[in-house]
Amino acid sequence: MAKSKGARIIVTLECTECRTNPDKRSPGVSRYTSTKNRRNTTNRLELKKFCTHCNKHTVHKEIK
């Protein structure tokens, strides 16, 4: 029998304000990678992280 990979997966978090705000410090979209446990956190991850393009702390949401 093959061993299962487990419930922990790598997800990408993207800044929500970079997509909508045209007057930001530099062009581009801030992205972070993180891990989450699929069994404990079934819904999409949402964390407050520092965005280097907006130059402030913003909400970063999980993308596919």
Swiss-Prot record:
Domain of life per record: Bacteria
BP GO terms, sorted: translation
One Pfam family, short name: Ribosomal_L33
GO molecular function: structural constituent of ribosome
Any one GO cellular component localisation term in the record: ribosome
InterPro entries found in the cross-reference section: Ribosomal_bL33, Ribosomal_bL33_CS, Ribosomal_bL33_sf, Ribosomal_zn-bd
Keyword Ribonucleoprotein included in the entry's annotation: yes
Keywords tagged on the record: Ribonucleoprotein, Ribosomal protein
SUPFAM superfamilies the UniProt entry points to: Zn-binding ribosomal proteins
NCBIfam families reported in the protein's UniProt record: PRK00504.1, PRK00595.1, rpmG_bact
HAMAP family according to UniProt: Ribosomal_bL33
Family the entry assigns: Belongs to the bacterial ribosomal protein bL33 family.
Protein name, as recorded: Large ribosomal subunit protein bL33
Gene of this entry: rpmG
